[in-house]
Amino acid sequence: MKPTVACLAGFLMLVLLAGCKGSVDESGARENKGDIEASGTVSAAGREQNGKWNEEQKKALPEKLNVLYAANDGLYLIRVLRNGADDADDAAVSTERLAEGTDISSPLFSSDGRTAGYLRQDGFYGCSIETGKEELLLNGALSFVPDGKEGFYASSGETGIVRVHMGREQEEVWKPEPVDGGWIQCEKLTLSPDGKKLAFARRRYVDRRKDPGLSLFEQNQGIWMLQMNLEKEKKLSVLIQIIGEEPPFFERMEETDGEPYPYLWPAKWSPDSSRLFIWQDVLSGSMRADGIGTAVYDTVSGTMIDPLGEQEEVVLPYNENVVFGEGNSLFLLAGAGREMALDKELVKIPPEKGAVHEKLKTPGLVPQSPQVSYDGKSIFFAASKELETGEQVEYPIWRQLYRMENGHVAELTNDTEYSSEFPVLTGDGSVLVFGRVDKEGGMSIWSIGTNGSGLQKLADLEENISTDETNEHYPAGYEDFYGRGSWSSIMSVYAFK
């Protein structure tokens, strides 16, 4: 996920904790009174009976919260202004359409929160949050990330990596050398929190049939990192190749007898910008659904670390299932089975090489999409009910939100009319923004305080769905594929203190 801007790449469905013995408190939530293994119990999160925020809670909440989302008729902005309100119902919530179109996807905020960046069919666009002015920033964009200030780093096959801003010309950052009969692409741009390291995957493509429309992927050329010189912002200090290039594609196929060969790409940085989490992806859809390999690059020592060591475990290959916590501890969903999302456990991996992994017990639950508080004391996640022996999975999977503290697991949501999924922690750590799906497939965006108070609906997405035109990037209805919902690149969150 990121201290100020959180980008949601894919929504996950969540399931109600069923069959839990215990009492029902006055807020309507259940509490399990008995110990479930040594890790603790499952209960309802503490909420005031009248639903209002107490003074301590109000101080912790952001004064303003902005949420971008892409519907199939345009890009929308939700503005939440608390303005001293005592509860969620009194906070001012407004929704406006920033840009029209049926081809908008992958929205995200600039680091200062003043610009919305997003994809259209012809490229990467920016739109001013204040004026609504829209501008094409890069034709044919492949990848883009906020640049730590008011603009974005972006890449295309023609330009390489550039820095783009609204109302200003592009600034060249790094352009690959020409390739005879093809070109090099810089993909999966990933900027460190301190803004000094920009990692990317470099891939070579060739035109084997002399037709640009029939070009083929040829070779992974490793993961690279630009060490930025912030005193001379347009210059580079160091260009480092983190992982070397692989043999060309067809040579690899001969070497491996057609077995899938991993495609390595950078995913997330640690909060202190010293470590980079890397996926070892595969082309096989069935293998990918069960999980893939991972690696961590330590920029201080210049060494690569295998976070799972010699364990025969794989990780669900979605960025929302991996997060760094305090002290560079890594939290991810790992397991060795073939039941995709349903046999994975929440694992905490200490930063020390070779350290013993800790499997965090979530009794009766199958977690997904963890978020870690900035003090490292709380873990928030979506979870479905654990299947009984012999029970068959039914899609879509139903989930709810939970919080874990000191081994104690508490429900944050428990409305059986909704599946609550993919929580995203705001930059100040006080609010979770998440998606919900009802039993008819309707989608909506909600927020809740991390202590379980202030549950609030922010927008009904189905109200903005056009019936005569369809955004090819936007799901017409909710579908759950291999235990992961199809809300891909719909939402971005920005909180103001």
Go through the PLM ranges and name each one:
Residues 13:
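Short glycine- and basic-residue-enriched patches
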Residues 24-497:
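Sequence signature of WD/YWTD-type beta-propeller architectures
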Residues 16-19:
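C-terminal motif of bacterial Sec signal peptides marking the signal peptidase cleavage site
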Residues 1-6, 10:
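Positively charged n-region of N-terminal signal peptides that target proteins for export
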